[in-house]
């Protein structure tokens, strides 16, 4: 029986300890790897990792990096994170590969129609790095794009310290109400910022099932899939 394809998007910040200046946390990466190893028994996993632990927009401004170039630095950061995580997963005996929208010879595989069609023929977990390969597009947009391209049945979006969608920013407004389930159209009507509009519109048009959850919570990916933790479900 063929395993279903899913996409998981996590931030680069989720790989580091907030109390440290290091780019990576051994404990967090181990926890993530253990969850992925368990999930790989039931699913073909497409993984998209942000690059914010290495490079962020504020750093670009501080150094005077032009926006287009800054976007490419950020995309390269996702390649670095994906390659590091791939090595960790391979050490656990998992079959993995890193695909990239930016060519990195000897390190990544090219993203093209053929590689996408055959992506899980020889691996359990595929990293989609390098964003869309173009500036001005977010990691959220890249996530939705890859989900469409591999016919993912489920898309999980891990947020830093936020366990789903609220009526307002819960960090600024204590009266903000948690939303357990919502349609794409309702979210658009209420102007809820779940992700950038390009990504959200793409997801709506292709009828993707989204689960928004707190990546920082213990065993959060597994618990979200098994409906055992707090998260928001978005569908048409």
Swiss-Prot record:
Pfam families from the entry?
AA_kinase
What does the entry list as the binding residues for UMP? 51, 71, 132-139
Q: What is its EC number?
A: 2.7.4.22
Provide one Gene Ontology biological process annotation: 'de novo' CTP biosynthetic process
**One of the record's GO molecular function terms:** UMP kinase activity
Write out the entry's keywords from A to Z. ATP-binding, Cytoplasm, Kinase, Nucleotide-binding, Pyrimidine biosynthesis, Transferase
Q: Name one GO cellular component term.
A: cytoplasm
**Where does it localize?**
Cytoplasm
Q: Which residues of this UniProt protein bind ATP?
A: 9-12, 52, 56, 166, 169
Catalysed reaction(s) here are: UMP + ATP = UDP + ADP
What InterPro entries would the database entry show? AceGlu_kinase-like_sf, Asp/Glu/Uridylate_kinase, Uridylate_kinase, Uridylate_kinase_bac
Q: What function is annotated for this protein?
A: Catalyzes the reversible phosphorylation of UMP to UDP.
Quaternary structure annotation from Swiss-Prot or TrEMBL: Homohexamer.
Name of the protein this chain belongs to: Uridylate kinase
Question: Per the UniProt entry, what species is this protein from, by scientific name?
Answer: Mycoplasmoides gallisepticum (strain R(low / passage 15 / clone 2)) (Mycoplasma gallisepticum)
Q: What lineage is this protein's organism placed in?
A: Bacteria, Bacillati, Mycoplasmatota, Mycoplasmoidales, Mycoplasmoidaceae
Q: Which gene encodes it?
A: pyrH
